[in-house]
Each structure stands twice: as C-alpha cells, then as structure tokens.
Amino acid sequence: MPLYLCFGAAAPVSILWREELFWGFVAAVKRRWHTVYARTNVDIQYPMAYCVGIQSLSPCKCHVTVVVCLTFLDLRMSAINEATKIMRAFFKTFFYHHGKVPRGRWFKLYRNDWCKDPNLTVGNYIVASGALPLMLGWARSTGLRFSTFTYSDEALWSHRRRDRRLARRREKLENKVSG
C-alpha cells in the first residue's frame, strides 16, 4: 500500500471552473513531483501515485483549497521538510508567479490527524491510500491515479494544450512570411 504526503494551498477560484487550468495544474504537479519521487524510489520501483483535488472548504470567496496527495517513500523528517519546501515553491510559482500570495497561511503540509483510523497513518504526516477517500470536502478530484497509466481526461487536455501551442507557432510563422 503506497504512502502519501498531502499538501494544501489557497488557489484562485478560476482553477475550479476552467478545465484547461485544472488539468494543466495536474500535469505540472506530476512533472514537478516526478523529480522528487525518483530520488526516493530508486530501489523500490513502485509507480508514482497521486490524487489532486479541490476542496470547497475555504475561508474566503476568492480562493479555493487545492489538495495534492503524492506518493512519498522516505519517512525521515528531513526528507519531508525538503519535499514541503519544494511543493511550497511549486505552488507559489504556479498560482502566484506575480508575487502576491494571499495573506495568512496559504500553504500547508497536512498533519494526518484528520484520518481517524490509526491503521492508515504513519508518524504525523504520512497516510496510506485508504485514507484519501476519508478526506472531506472534495468539490472535484482526480481520484487516486498512477503515473504509469495514461488517463483519457488528462490526455484530452494535454492534446488540446499542444494543439493551441502549435496553432500559435503556425500563426507566428505565417505573420513572418506575410509581413
């Protein structure tokens, strides 16, 4: 049974309503976490698993809480702290690249005290995959997924993003040729 770290961050409400933003975020999380995961998974060879979701539980109307649960196999506190720093920087770059993060606590590594089943927790922060459905307030979620499998909804949005990028390049080339 894989073990997970769960991160949460305040994100602009637009991520909830815009499909391309949500699936772009999922793809970016996978790309960023893969480098972290590869370092801790050298000898185990277990596929990276993830669950990305949006919770409707938010203290303000201009932000939603994005929750990212990622496979993590290194149980040392120093490794957990390093992973937390990496994900904090990732969230800040993805949502707040202009530099204005929300006031107050906008990012956190979830303690596993929300899971009442002691068989599904390890230490203070790690949870087993059976605990993920117990997290309340999901407005939207990918569900538990593995990086070794291609999911149709993720593939659809990655193709659309690629097609738009190619169309923009084609348009630039046509403008250069005609101008």
UniProtKB/Swiss-Prot annotation:
InterPro entries: Avian_adenovirus_Orf17. This is Uncharacterized protein ORF17. It comes from Fowl adenovirus A serotype 1 (strain CELO / Phelps) (FAdV-1). Pfam families: DUF5506.
